[in-house]
């Protein structure tokens, strides 16, 4: 039955064009720009992310990350993208569709990060809006889920402005920055209907 099939890409997924942004899979040649942006944005990002390993910004750790993304792609478990500003090809952030669940679920989880110099300029909103047709069309997902810490007003605003609906509250849902944190749970359905 076609409904239960997985997606098999023999190559990386295509680049996705959005309003002023391009989403494309990361590659090793992105390391220097990626590491510099993450380092510059460390204090901005760490309150909202899992604890960074000590070697997180090294070339070898980035290589492992690229390999993991490749394995996730081959097994239809995840799709990673860098967000590139189209006006000058600057790397501004990243976005993933991860934890892809097939069968009767046909769902995945949206994750994202934005570099500090590019925050609050609409790039992430454009990126999320661009990846939604890929998730529902190419990947044939029925549901995209996302979670954010209740005090992360930027993420709450982003999700609500891109059609996600708040569905619940999960206590100590994820270990973020070394602490088990409560999260707001959001989802967007393929048909866009709000129950």
What are these regions (language model features)?
Residues 46-67:
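Conserved GNAT-fold acetyl-CoA-binding loop/helix
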Residues 71-77, 164:
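Short loop/turn motifs at secondary-structure junctions and domain boundaries
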Residues 1-33, 37-47, 80-195:
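Acyl-donor (CoA/ACP) binding surface of acyl/acetyltransferases
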Residues 68-72, 134:
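A generic secondary-structure signal
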């Amino acid at each position: 039955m076609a409904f239960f099939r997985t997606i098999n890409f023999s190559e990386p997924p295509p680049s996705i064009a959005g309003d002023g942004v391009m989403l494309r899979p990361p590659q090793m040649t992105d390391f220097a720009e990626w590491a510099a942006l993450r380092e510059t944005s460390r204090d901005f990002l760490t309150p909202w992310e899992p604890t960074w390993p000590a070697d997180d910004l090294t070339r070898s750790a980035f290589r492992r990350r690229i390999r993991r993304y490749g394995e996730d792609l081959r097994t239809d478990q995840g799709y990673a993208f860098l967000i590139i500003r189209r006006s000058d090809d600057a790397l501004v952030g990243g976005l993933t569709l991860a934890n892809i669940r097939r069968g009767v679920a046909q769902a995945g989880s949206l994750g994202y990060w934005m570099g500090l110099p590019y925050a609050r300029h609409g790039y992430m909103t454009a990126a999320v809006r661009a990846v939604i047709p890929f998730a529902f069309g190419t990947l044939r997902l029925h549901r995209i889920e996302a979670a954010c810490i209740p005090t992360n007003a930027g993420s709450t605003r982003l999700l609500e402005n891109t059609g996600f609906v708040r569905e619940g509250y999960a206590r100590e849902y994820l270990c973020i920055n070394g602490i088990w944190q409560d999260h707001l749970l959001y989802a967007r359905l393929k048909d866009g209907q709000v129950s």
